[in-house]
Amino acid sequence: PASADALARLAGGRACDMLSAQALAFDGPLLVAPAMNPRMWAHAATQDNVATLRRRGVRILAPGNGSTACGDQGQGRLVSSDELLLACLQALAPQDMAGLRVMVTLGPTREPWDGVRFWSNPSSGRMGAALATAAWLRGATVEAVCGPGCPPLPDGVRRHDVRTAREMFEAAQSLWSEMDLGAFSAAVADFSPVPYGEAKFKKEGASDGFSVSFASNPDILRTLSLGRREGQKVLGFAAETAPDMDALMTLVRGKRQRKQADLLAGNAVNAPGCGFGTDSNSMAVLDKNGHEEIWTSQSKADVAWKLWSWLLRV
């Protein structure tokens, strides 16, 4: 980590050791991750050096709060390895989405039936998290509407946690008018059970079985796609089971037409090692101009990157 002395050397333009000499000679993006005693970090001299570096375009990954190596409590802990990695990736990534406002829906929804049971699906939110992260790395301002159990997102992504399809619809609808791009990757329940009530349904009253009625939920993708303003672009997703990728593409063609998405990605959730809860997807992708591609067993991170690049140019 960058010590108080290292910050002083960098701010003063020193070239007295390998680190300061390399930093002074380097004309690319410079990231500095300090860690030190909390009183050293708060000292006016250190803060002046930090301000000087920031004015020169250096990105400072400010230390976190907690117990430091000397045993004192306060701001001085090195940021996590995940934060360091994301900051480095962002510095190296093309900023071709800078200035764009992006909304991503991700994860499942849970439709309650009684006090303990609900209707849902096994979506993990990993595909949507990959989309949100990729857009943020490429410079976009990202709003993520997250169903239950979604993975962590970069601190720079604004997260909106919801539970039901209705809540996801309302959250997405409230954000959509200000967005430039939307990726609707959430596995939203198409139907909700008509609620039994807040109490737990007891099996003793249904020894011969029972029936549950369902009501339709809002179609988030279609509603927001049809209601978009000029210039907005829509990336839709379809979780499907199909015997092969050609059959999946047939399903995608029909769904893209119904949803009026600029780009639609069909996900073969029954493909081995792909789909819900995995790190890979097999996709059939189609845009509004009729261009089609099939991607087999690719990482969700790679899929996310490619989908944004495609949506930008469609």
Language-model region placement:
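Short glycine-rich anion-binding loops that position phosphate/pyrophosphate groups of nucleotides
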Residues: 1-8, 36, 66, 107-111, ...
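Glycine-rich phosphate/diphosphate-binding loop of Rossmann-like nucleotide-binding domains
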Residues: 47, 51-52, 94-164
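Gly/Ser/Thr-rich active-site loops/lids in small-molecule metabolic enzymes
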Residues: 120-138, 201-222, 257-266, 294-301, ...
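Short, acidic/small-residue loops that bind anionic groups at enzyme active sites
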Residues: 10-37, 52-54, 59-61, 207-223
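Glycine/threonine-rich flexible loop motifs
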Residues: 4-14, 40-43, 113-120, 191-203, ...
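Short, glycine-/small-residue-rich phosphate/pyrophosphate-handling segment
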Residues: 27-65, 73-88, 227-263
